[in-house]
């Protein structure tokens, strides 16, 4: 099979996206009413990696929705550039001597975009909603006895057992971030996306100027009071220097490159190597790797349905994938990528080589074929949801289908944009009922380092993240890891986790790559985070 290193894709917004966001073009609030358009110099136009399919950063782990959340919401805590957790909306906090009670006092002057005051009731409800949905939150809430308000400005979390990572999880920037919402939004079912977008963060969502599938507009919140500290990582003062931020949807990368060169847009989150050459030598633009930990592509299998409800079929996927071929198909230059066999990602603290003979041995179609046979595979269709809006995942899907067919599997590609995948991956049923067999996605390289905060590291069955693997030993080891007294102790448990995981196989990896962003030369102040692109602190000129 011949695969090019670039897949250019065009398309309009899907009907599933429109259905997911029914109020975007109809609902209005005082905070988002149409305003006089700011001067072009005060607007940052950004082309992101995907269209915004959902407004709810708790209901979905989609990275683009987390970016949206970072603009309009705020958090109780955040990690600075040295990975130290710092207070954000919190003025001060106290922990009882036994480690079971946490008391948080909010900063004065916090207000939502609709003018209402941020209260401890809002925060308590937000923490509960996050805890019911997020992987780290679910793990934490196994030890939470109560979360409640103690007056307007104080929130109390009571634990049944000490949990050393509580503040870290409240301040993490990996999906899903623990964003603070209004109580009336936060008390809704966390599995059903909210359609309101009213937070207390540095930018306000402008529904009047938003065009679903085309552009999403955020205006500076004139009432936001940033912290006095300098911006650092996901912490410090979130200063909205630009009057307006616009997420511009441009699926065709050549169109986006041309728009950047013409000054019609200011920032491209990702550029492919073959198109990036058009930017070389042009002093009006520059490129930068913002996420130094890279991205790791992975595939999730529907562990509730055959054939992947059998561990043998999942083991087959480890032997089936040639990570170098997947990366070569899109990135070409090997300096842009590498293979990775560690459950915890490569270049991370917890990286290890336990139980990686399958990776060191390279692709083995014959072994994969034998394992599918041992699993009892009966020839039924295995649907691969091919993400058409990502060149690397689209190319990987094509290769994966080819390799599965070589292993005797009836692989069927179903092309979908990201919004379509987000909608369909929630279906736990068989293919005949709209289900699926495999979908491909990615996460920041740093996200894999932590077996608690990455939702896909859980093995809690149908209560967990899409794919729904289940393994009791894995969950016991995750519990032990979070309670471990030192980094060295965690590293030892990480080896045990990986040894066990590559036997039951919760997912499989496609390789690790390093995205290069491009921007106009006058764009200043971008903060490089591993998990999202924040746009506070950014200016032009």
List where the protein language model places each region.
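Extracytoplasmic/peripheral linker and loop segments enriched in polar/acidic and small residues
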Residues: 37, 359-362, 412-426, 452-521, ...
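N-terminal lobe/hinge region of extracytoplasmic solute-binding protein
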Residues: 47-97, 125-128, 198, 509
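Surface-exposed binding/hinge segments that line
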Residues: 139-186, 191-211
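Structural transition elements
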Residues: 203-204, 335-374, 390-395
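Ligand/substrate-recognition segments at binding pockets and active sites
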Residues: 212-214, 252-253, 271-273, 337, ...
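Ligand-site clamp/hinge motif
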Residues: 226-278, 410
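Periplasmic-binding protein-like
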Residues: 278, 304, 308-348, 395-396, ...
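Long beta-strand-rich cores associated with HINT superfamily self-processing modules
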Residues: 519-541
């Amino acid at each position: 099979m011949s695969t090019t290193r670039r897949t250019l894709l065009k398309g309009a917004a899907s009907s599933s996206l429109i259905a997911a966001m029914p109020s975007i073009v109809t609902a209005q609030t005082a905070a988002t009413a149409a305003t006089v358009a700011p001067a072009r110099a005060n607007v940052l136009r950004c082309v992101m990696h995907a269209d915004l399919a959902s407004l709810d950063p708790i209901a979905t782990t989609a990275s683009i929705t987390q970016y949206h959340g970072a603009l309009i919401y705020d958090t109780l805590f955040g990690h600075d550039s040295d990975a130290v957790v710092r207070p954000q909306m919190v003025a001060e906090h106290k922990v009882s001597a036994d480690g079971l009670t946490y008391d948080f006092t909010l900063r004065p002057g916090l207000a939502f975009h609709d003018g209402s005051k941020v209260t401890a009731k809002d925060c308590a409800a937000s923490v509960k909603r996050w805890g019911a949905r997020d992987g780290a939150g679910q793990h934490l809430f196994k030890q939470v006895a109560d979360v409640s308000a103690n007056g307007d400005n104080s929130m109390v979390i009571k634990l049944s057992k000490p949990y050393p990572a509580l503040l870290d999880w409240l301040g993490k920037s990996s999906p899903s971030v623990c964003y603070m919402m209004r109580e009336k939004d936060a008390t809704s079912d966390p599995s059903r996306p909210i359609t309101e977008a009213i937070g207390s963060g540095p930018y306000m969502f402008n529904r009047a100027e938003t065009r679903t599938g085309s552009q999403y507009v955020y205006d500076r919140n004139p009432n936001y009071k940033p912290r006095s500290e300098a911006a650092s990582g996901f912490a410090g003062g979130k200063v909205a220097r630009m009057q307006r931020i616009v997420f511009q949807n441009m699926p065709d990368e050549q169109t986006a490159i041309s728009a950047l060169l013409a000054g019609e847009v200011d920032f491209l989150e990702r550029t492919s190597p073959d198109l990036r050459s058009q930017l070389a030598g042009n002093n009006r633009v520059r490129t930068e790797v913002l996420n130094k930990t890279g991205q790791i592509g992975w595939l999730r299998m529907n562990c509730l349905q055959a054939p992947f409800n059998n561990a043998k079929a999942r083991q087959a996927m480890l032997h089936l994938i040639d990570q170098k071929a997947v990366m070569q198909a899109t990135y070409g230059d090997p300096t842009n990528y590498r293979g990775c066999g560690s459950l915890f990602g490569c270049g991370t603290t917890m990286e290890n080589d336990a139980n990686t003979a399958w990776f060191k041995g390279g692709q083995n179609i014959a072994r994969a074929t034998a394992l599918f046979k041992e699993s009892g595979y009966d020839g039924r269709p295995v649907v691969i949801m091919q993400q058409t809006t990502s060149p690397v995942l689209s190319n990987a899907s094509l290769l994966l289908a080819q390799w599965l067919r070589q292993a005797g599997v009836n692989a069927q590609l179903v092309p979908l944009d990201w919004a379509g995948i987000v909608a369909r991956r929630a279906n736990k049923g068989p293919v005949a009922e709209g289900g699926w067999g495999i979908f491909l996605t990615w996460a920041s390289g740093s996200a894999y380092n932590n077996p608690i905060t990455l939702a896909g590291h859980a093995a809690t069955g149908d209560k967990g993240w899409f794919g729904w693997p289940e393994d009791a030993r894995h969950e016991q080891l995750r519990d032990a890891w979070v309670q471990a007294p030192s980094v060295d102790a965690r590293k030892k448990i990480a080896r045990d986790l990986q040894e066990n995981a590559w036997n039951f196989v919760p997912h499989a990896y496609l390789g690790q790559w390093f995205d290069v962003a491009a921007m106009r030369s006058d764009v200043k102040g971008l903060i490089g985070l591993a998990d999202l692109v924040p746009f506070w602190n950014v200016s032009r000129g």
